[in-house]
A protein has these predicted regions:
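Aromatic- and glycine-enriched pocket-lining scaffold segments that form the walls
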Residues: 1-50, 54
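Outer-membrane beta-barrel pore domains
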Residues: 49-200
Length: 200
């Protein structure tokens, strides 16, 4: 990892990360001997504005599940992931973020994993408060009848008591795809989150 092209204004125009890791993803152990390759580039044209792209290639091991077999077949199932996003975060004002990610595994000419996710977020720093509104979606193109296929509208607010302690309240309204509606028996759901976050 590193930074290049110093702006002379307290930040660099380009940050990069390159990693070779064990596991089916960089943060998860795997029993095979394949390595994951991870590459990430962040372009920072202005102090509060970042554009980032990430690519991950690896091979995961099928997991034996209770009552059935694992996803894929064998110890070396290919998996590709990429994420692109941009964000503008002024600690005294506007916070805008958007991100899209795709994950795919194809074994014996069949999609075993094919998933898409995205979100758009807008917020505004008001002293110790950060109110936000967010839209996000997730699409599982293989398991279309699960609750993983949704669009969500979220309204939330974070209150920073001090640097290492925050309280957060979120309300989310989920809307499900047609196949998920049929399988679940309902077309929407609600979620309320109340969280306390500490750093030591």
């Amino acid at each position: 990892m590193g930074d290049v092209f110093d702006s002379g204004k307290g930040f660099s125009y380009l940050h990069y990360d390159v990693a070779v890791t064990n596991g089916s993803i960089p943060c998860k152990d795997d029993s095979n001997k394949s390595k994951d390759i991870y590459v990430s580039l962040t372009v920072r044209p202005a102090k509060h504005f970042n554009i980032k792209g990430t690519f991950n290639w690896g091979e995961y091991t099928s997991k034996q599940l209770e009552g059935g077999t694992g996803v894929g077949s064998g110890d070396y199932n290919p998996m590709n992931r990429y994420v692109v996003g941009a964000w503008y975060d002024n600690p005294r004002g506007l916070n805008l973020r958007a991100e899209y990610g795709h994950m795919k595994s194809r074994v014996n000419k069949a999609d075993i994993v094919k998933e898409n996710g995205a979100y758009v977020l807008a917020g505004w720093h008001l002293g110790k408060f950060l109110p936000i509104v967010r839209w996000d979606m997730y699409e599982d193109c293989v398991n279309t009848g699960t609750a993983n296929n949704y669009n969500r509208i979220l309204i939330g607010c974070t209150y920073s008591v001090f640097k290492n302690m925050k309280f957060q309240v979120n309300y989310g309204h989920f809307m499900y795809g047609d196949d998920a509606k049929k399988a679940l028996g309902y077309d929407s759901s609600e979620q309320l989150q109340i969280m306390a976050m500490f750093k030591f």
